[in-house]
């Protein structure tokens, strides 16, 4: 092991400074750049050299990643002691005007002389790879959500529409052998009733799949129409509150909010055993929040979900497609609260 005070270690550190792909900049206690290696000259040009470090860096900085945004100048890392105590991601403009992401440090290395070191490591390839992996995950989630939707539609077609159509088919076949005119008319009226119900079922299914009002008028109108139909069909009252009025959001976000709320309501209908369900939609700052609350049976979150379990799984899958999250608070006998939170 090389002695920390040895000339050999100093030589190695000098070689690292001169030949490293890591960009290294030193500034004195007045903020003036006193040295930078060749790698740093991709960022700080000769005209920036020996100027105030804040001016030189700010001239090239496009923001760093913090709690507020991916690229922000709020609580600048040059001034924040909390940021300086950690590695952070910063976006810098190179001399050829390309904005590149870097892992950076900005720390005091010589307290007596007030010398700071600013280091940058290019992470473009890592971020590009992460984005590819993220896109692949999102694609898998999208396909999974589509498959779950197809399964749901298949079940509904089999359990309602196809069964009714088979019933009509049987009754139509029997009409051929019916000689009693009065009974024939009675059977015909019954078939008319079944066909009318079948039309309603298909219309309702069409609305559930993609209501025209969602595309044309937005969430507020789509929900009011859906809740009215829901109350008529199932006799369960929906207490709806909202502050979004006629505000429109990205189409993908509106679809996710509509689907998650719809799924949460249907789950409450199937398992909660309640006469009313509370639904709230609100925009708070840079987030869109949807809540579905019932005071019904509740369930044990650690137990296996009732039914297929695709409902709860599908809600999370959908939310992740728009960088959102679903939180479910429930307890047996105390109801369920489903909260969807989406950044906008």
Curated annotation (Swiss-Prot):
<keyword id="KW-0963">Cytoplasm</keyword>
<dbReference type="InterPro" id="IPR005467">
    <property type="entry name" value="His_kinase_dom"/>
</dbReference>
<dbReference type="InterPro" id="IPR036890">
    <property type="entry name" value="HATPase_C_sf"/>
</dbReference>
<keyword id="KW-0004">4Fe-4S</keyword>
<keyword id="KW-0597">Phosphoprotein</keyword>
<keyword id="KW-0067">ATP-binding</keyword>
<feature type="binding site">
    <location>
        <position position="58"/>
    </location>
    <ligand>
        <name>[4Fe-4S] cluster</name>
    </ligand>
</feature>
<dbReference type="GO" id="GO:0051539">
    <property type="term" value="F:4 iron, 4 sulfur cluster binding"/>
</dbReference>
<keyword id="KW-0411">Iron-sulfur</keyword>
<dbReference type="Pfam" id="PF02518">
    <property type="entry name" value="HATPase_c"/>
</dbReference>
<feature type="domain" description="Histidine kinase">
    <location>
        <begin position="152"/>
        <end position="344"/>
    </location>
</feature>
<dbReference type="InterPro" id="IPR017203">
    <property type="entry name" value="Sig_transdc_His_kinase_NreB"/>
</dbReference>
<feature type="binding site">
    <location>
        <position position="73"/>
    </location>
    <ligand>
        <name>[4Fe-4S] cluster</name>
    </ligand>
</feature>
<keyword id="KW-0902">Two-component regulatory system</keyword>
<feature type="binding site">
    <location>
        <position position="76"/>
    </location>
    <ligand>
        <name>[4Fe-4S] cluster</name>
    </ligand>
</feature>
<dbReference type="GO" id="GO:0016020">
    <property type="term" value="C:membrane"/>
</dbReference>
<dbReference type="Pfam" id="PF07730">
    <property type="entry name" value="HisKA_3"/>
</dbReference>
<keyword id="KW-0418">Kinase</keyword>
<comment type="function">
    <text>Member of the two-component regulatory system NreB/NreC involved in the control of dissimilatory nitrate/nitrite reduction in response to oxygen. NreB functions as a direct oxygen sensor histidine kinase which is autophosphorylated, in the absence of oxygen, probably at the conserved histidine residue, and transfers its phosphate group probably to a conserved aspartate residue of NreC. NreB/NreC activates the expression of the nitrate (narGHJI) and nitrite (nir) reductase operons, as well as the putative nitrate transporter gene narT.</text>
</comment>
<dbReference type="GO" id="GO:0000155">
    <property type="term" value="F:phosphorelay sensor kinase activity"/>
</dbReference>
<dbReference type="GO" id="GO:0005506">
    <property type="term" value="F:iron ion binding"/>
</dbReference>
<dbReference type="GO" id="GO:0005524">
    <property type="term" value="F:ATP binding"/>
</dbReference>
<dbReference type="InterPro" id="IPR004358">
    <property type="entry name" value="Sig_transdc_His_kin-like_C"/>
</dbReference>
<keyword id="KW-0408">Iron</keyword>
<feature type="binding site">
    <location>
        <position position="61"/>
    </location>
    <ligand>
        <name>[4Fe-4S] cluster</name>
    </ligand>
</feature>
<feature type="modified residue" description="Phosphohistidine; by autocatalysis">
    <location>
        <position position="158"/>
    </location>
</feature>
<keyword id="KW-0547">Nucleotide-binding</keyword>
<dbReference type="GO" id="GO:0046983">
    <property type="term" value="F:protein dimerization activity"/>
</dbReference>
<dbReference type="InterPro" id="IPR050482">
    <property type="entry name" value="Sensor_HK_TwoCompSys"/>
</dbReference>
<protein>
    <recommendedName>
        <fullName>Oxygen sensor histidine kinase NreB</fullName>
        <ecNumber>2.7.13.3</ecNumber>
    </recommendedName>
</protein>
<keyword id="KW-0808">Transferase</keyword>
<dbReference type="GO" id="GO:0005737">
    <property type="term" value="C:cytoplasm"/>
</dbReference>
<keyword id="KW-0479">Metal-binding</keyword>
<dbReference type="InterPro" id="IPR011712">
    <property type="entry name" value="Sig_transdc_His_kin_sub3_dim/P"/>
</dbReference>
